[in-house]
């Protein structure tokens, strides 16, 4: 499948839609496979728009976008993504999906929703932040909101999110919460209580509004967004010009369109390759960093074991010395007793 088949026409249509009827808020769900991104998207939309199942193997295979119109007429555009930042995911797949995600976000991202599950927080999830910053720069942190799924499990345990995080909050998660000003919300995607459903969505949208206000109403956008938008507009304009050509046969018109599509596809390939290069460099750096951290951890464990062994040896030696001293004391007392009797 070519890049054009993957997203060419889709991008053109999206950018054209964005110019005439821009969704007020665009939210992008990212996170590890199986964390509940699709279920969270469905909760936000108020309907089952994305495929979702309770399993650690994700069912989302490509970026998707769905919209909901609120009572006040505002439009919420929700973009669901597969596990883009798992270290095991191929860079070429991620590159294509990043380009697709950007196109679905249309003219910018109002909030990045980092989805974590309270059921399984793993150290490898620290890569999400590194990948996001490598692709979009440190400014992306200003648009991040942390969403925890598994609210049903905490309710069963009669535990609040604050209590859960007080007991278990890895360093990487503390860092993420710190750089996004502790913007976090808990979702129970299994509840059938309409009031609870509405409350958690409203809390999230309130956080989105705070992000929008903090960023002066401007959605996140960078060179990738601008370049993709320019290429899509160029493609649309060129096709319109071809439609207006006179004195050419239908076959010739079709050939012109084909050449335009091929040119657009080449530009998409170039942009995607640029994204893939960034991803590979980041993955290589992260793997090296994780390797160094693991080596340092093993070295620390080795030293701790050595200290413990040394301490055990010293304690054993002290005990032996004490026992010998006690024995010598008893022998001395025995000798003294004999001397007194004499």
Curated annotation (Swiss-Prot):
Residue sites binding GTP per the record: 31-39, 52, 189
Region (G3): 80-83
SUPFAM superfamilies linked to this entry: P-loop containing nucleoside triphosphate hydrolases
G2, as annotated region: 58-62
Region named G4: 149-152
Any GO BP annotation: negative regulation of defense response to bacterium
Record key words, sorted: Coiled coil, GTP-binding, Nucleotide-binding
The organism's place on the tree of life at top rank: Eukaryota
Positions of region (G1): 31-38
Induction per the UniProt record: Up-regulated by brassinolides. Down-regulated by 2-aminoethoxyvinylglycine (AVG), high CO(2), isoxaben, and propiconazole treatments.
Entry similarity comment: Belongs to the TRAFAC class TrmE-Era-EngA-EngB-Septin-like GTPase superfamily. AIG1/Toc34/Toc159-like paraseptin GTPase family. IAN subfamily.
Protein name per Swiss-Prot or TrEMBL: Immune-associated nucleotide-binding protein 9
């Amino acid at each position: 499948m070519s890049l054009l088949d993957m997203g060419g026409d889709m991008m053109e249509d999206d950018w054209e839609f964005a110019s005439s009827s821009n969704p007020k808020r665009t939210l992008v769900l990212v996170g590890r496979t199986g964390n509940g991104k699709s279920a969270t998207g469905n909760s936000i939309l108020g309907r089952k728009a994305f495929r979702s199942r309770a399993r650690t193997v994700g069912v989302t295979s490509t970026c998707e976008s769905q919209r909901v119109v609120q009572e006040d007429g505002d439009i919420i555009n929700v973009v669901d993504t597969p596990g883009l930042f798992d270290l095991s995911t191929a860079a070429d797949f991620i590159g294509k999906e990043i380009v697709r995600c950007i196109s679905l976000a249309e003219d910018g991202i109002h909030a990045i929703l980092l989805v974590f599950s309270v059921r399984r927080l793993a150290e490898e999830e620290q890569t999400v932040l590194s990948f996001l910053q490598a692709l979009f720069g440190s400014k992306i942190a200003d648009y991040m909101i942390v969403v925890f799924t598994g609210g049903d499990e905490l309710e069963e345990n009669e535990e609040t999110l604050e209590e859960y995080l007080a007991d278990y909050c890895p360093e990487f998660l503390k860092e993420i919460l710190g750089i996004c000003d502790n913007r976090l919300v808990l979702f129970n995607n299994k509840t059938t209580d309409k009031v609870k459903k509405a409350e958690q969505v409203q809390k999230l949208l309130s956080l989105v509004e705070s992000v929008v206000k903090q960023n002066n109403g401007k959605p996140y956008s960078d060179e990738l967004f601008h370049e993709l938008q320019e290429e899509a507009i160029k493609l649309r304009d060129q096709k319109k010009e071809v439609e207006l050509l006179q004195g050419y046969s239908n076959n010739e018109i079709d050939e012109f369109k084909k050449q335009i599509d091929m040119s657009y596809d080449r530009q998409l390939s170039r942009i995607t390759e640029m994204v893939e290069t960034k991803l590979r460099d980041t993955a290589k750096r992260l793997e090296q960093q994780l390797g160094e951290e693991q080596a340092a951890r093993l070295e620390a464990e080795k030293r701790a074991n050595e200290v413990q062994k040394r301490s055990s040896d010293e304690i054993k030696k002290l005990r032996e010395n004490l026992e010998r001293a006690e024995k010598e004391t008893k022998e001395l007392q025995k000798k003294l007793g004999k001397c007194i009797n004499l």
